[in-house]
C-alpha cells in the first residue's frame, strides 16, 4: 500500500511539473518567427533539456530509498525546490544586452580616438611657425659663434678655440685686468698726493726775424725730483731749469743751474726789474756741480705781468 501510494504521488508530481513547463514555455513545440526572440527560445530549450535530467536523478534517488517513509518526504521537498526555479517573471534578452555593450564599446572607442586626435593636433606646430623657429635658432647660434670668435681674438695666449676654453680664459683675463686696474688706481692716488703742478722752462732759443728778437720756451709738468744719477744727467742737459709757482700774491721760484760764480746775484737783479719783493732765499748744493736756488717773493697790487715772462728774464740773466 505504501509503495502504490508513493508511485501515485510521484506521477501526480510529474504531471504538475510538465504542465508548469508548458505554461512557462509555450514555444517549445513551435518554431519561432520573431528574429529578436531567438535567444529567448534557445534559453527555454536549455531549461527543458536540463530539468528532465535532474528529474531522472531525483527519480533514481527515490527508487533507491523507496523502502523508508522518510525518503518520500525528502523527495517531496526536492520536488518543491525544483518547481521554485521556473519563475516566469525573470526574462532577459541577451541580444539586447550584447547590442548595448557593443554600442558602449564603440562610443568609448570614438571618444578615445577624438581625444588622441586633439592631443596630436595640439602638440603639432604649423609649418611656417616651425620654419621661423628654425631660422631664429640658426641666427642666434651664428651670433653666438661670432661673439666667441671676437672674444678669442682679444685673449692673449689662447691655446684652444672651443667654447669652454674661450670662456674660461676670458674670465681669467678679466680677473687679471681688474687686479691691474686696482693696483694702478692705488698708485695714482699715492702719486696724486705727491704730484705738484710745476712749470719747467728749458733752454731758451733765440729766433732772429729782421731786427726784432723773440724768446720761446717749452713748459711741461713734472714729478718731484730725485737724487738718482739719471735725474742728475737730465738736469745737466736741460740746465738751467726754472720752476715757478704762484699762490695768491706769493711767487715761489726754484732754479736748478750749474755751479757758477754770480748766479744768485744775476737772479736777484732780474727780479728787481719786475719790482718783486724778495721775502726769503737760500741755496743748496745738489751734487758736485749743481745748485738749487729757492727764492720766495711777494707781488704788489700793480704787478700784472705773466709768470712766464719772469722766468724768461731769469734764464736770459743766467745765460749772460
Curated annotation (Swiss-Prot):
Annotated region described as Disordered, given as residue ranges: 53-105
Cell cycle keyword on record: no
Subcellular location: Nucleus
Pfam families named in the record: HLH
Ranges for domain bHLH: 128-177
Classification via SUPFAM superfamilies: HLH, helix-loop-helix DNA-binding domain
PROSITE patterns: BHLH
Leader peptide range in chain numbering: none
Gene Ontology CC terms: nucleus
Compositionally skewed regions (Low complexity) per UniProt: 58-80
GO biological process terms held by the UniProt record: endoplasmic reticulum organization; regulation of DNA-templated transcription
Ranges of compositional bias, category Polar residues: 81-105
An MF annotation (GO) of this entry: DNA binding
Keywords of this entry: Activator, DNA-binding, Nucleus, Transcription, Transcription regulation
Tissue specificity: Expressed constitutively in roots, leaves, stems, and flowers.
Function in brief: Transcription activator that regulates the expression of at least NAI2, PYK10 and PBP1. Required for and mediates the formation of endoplasmic reticulum bodies (ER bodies). Involved in the symbiotic interactions with the endophytes of the Sebacinaceae fungus family, such as Piriformospora indica and Sebacina.
Subunit field text: Homodimer.
Protein name: Transcription factor NAI1
Lineage, opening ranks: Eukaryota, Viridiplantae, Streptophyta, Embryophyta, Tracheophyta
GN (gene name): NAI1
Amino acid at each position: 500500500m505504501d509503495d502504490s501510494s508513493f508511485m501515485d504521488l510521484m506521477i501526480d508530481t510529474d504531471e504538475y511539473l510538465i504542465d508548469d513547463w508548458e505554461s512557462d514555455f509555450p514555444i517549445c513545440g513551435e518554431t519561432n518567427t520573431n528574429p529578436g526572440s531567438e535567444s529567448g527560445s534557445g534559453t527555454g530549450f536549455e531549461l527543458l533539456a536540463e530539468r528532465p535530467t535532474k528529474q531522472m536523478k531525483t527519480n533514481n534517488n527515490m527508487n533507491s530509498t523507496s523502502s523508508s517513509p522518510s525518503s518520500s518526504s525528502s523527495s517531496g521537498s526536492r520536488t518543491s525546490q525544483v518547481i521554485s526555479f521556473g519563475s516566469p517573471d525573470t526574462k532577459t534578452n541577451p541580444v539586447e544586452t550584447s547590442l548595448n555593450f557593443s554600442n558602449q564599446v564603440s562610443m568609448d572607442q570614438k571618444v578615445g580616438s577624438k581625444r588622441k586626435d586633439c592631443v596630436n593636433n595640439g602638440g603639432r606646430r604649423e609649418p611656417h611657425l616651425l620654419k621661423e623657429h628654425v631660422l631664429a635658432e640658426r641666427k642666434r647660434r651664428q651670433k653666438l659663434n661670432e661673439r666667441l670668435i671676437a672674444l678669442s681674438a682679444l685673449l692673449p695666449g689662447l691655446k684652444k678655440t672651443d667654447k669652454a676654453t674661450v670662456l674660461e680664459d676670458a674670465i681669467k683675463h678679466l680677473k687679471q685686468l681688474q687686479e691691474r686696474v686696482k693696483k694702478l688706481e692705488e698708485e695714482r692716488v699715492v702719486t696724486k698726493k705727491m704730484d705738484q703742478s710745476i712749470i719747467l722752462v728749458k733752454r731758451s732759443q733765440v729766433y732772429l726775424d729782421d731786427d726784432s728778437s723773440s724768446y720761446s720756451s717749452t713748459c711741461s709738468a713734472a714729478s718731484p725730483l730725485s737724487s738718482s744719477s739719471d735725474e742728475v744727467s737730465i738736469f745737466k742737459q736741460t740746465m738751467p731749469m726754472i720752476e715757478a709757482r704762484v699762490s695768491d700774491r706769493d711767487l715761489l721760484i726754484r732754479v736748478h743751474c750749474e755751479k757758477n760764480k754770480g748766479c744768485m746775484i744775476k737772479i736777484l737783479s732780474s727780479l728787481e726789474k719786475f719790482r718783486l719783493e724778495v721775502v726769503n732765499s737760500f741755496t743748496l748744493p745738489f751734487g758736485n756741480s749743481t745748485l738749487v736756488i729757492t727764492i720766495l717773493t711777494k707781488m704788489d697790487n700793480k704787478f700784472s705781468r705773466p709768470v712766464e715772462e719772469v722766468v724768461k728774464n731769469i734764464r736770459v740773466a743766467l745765460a749772460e
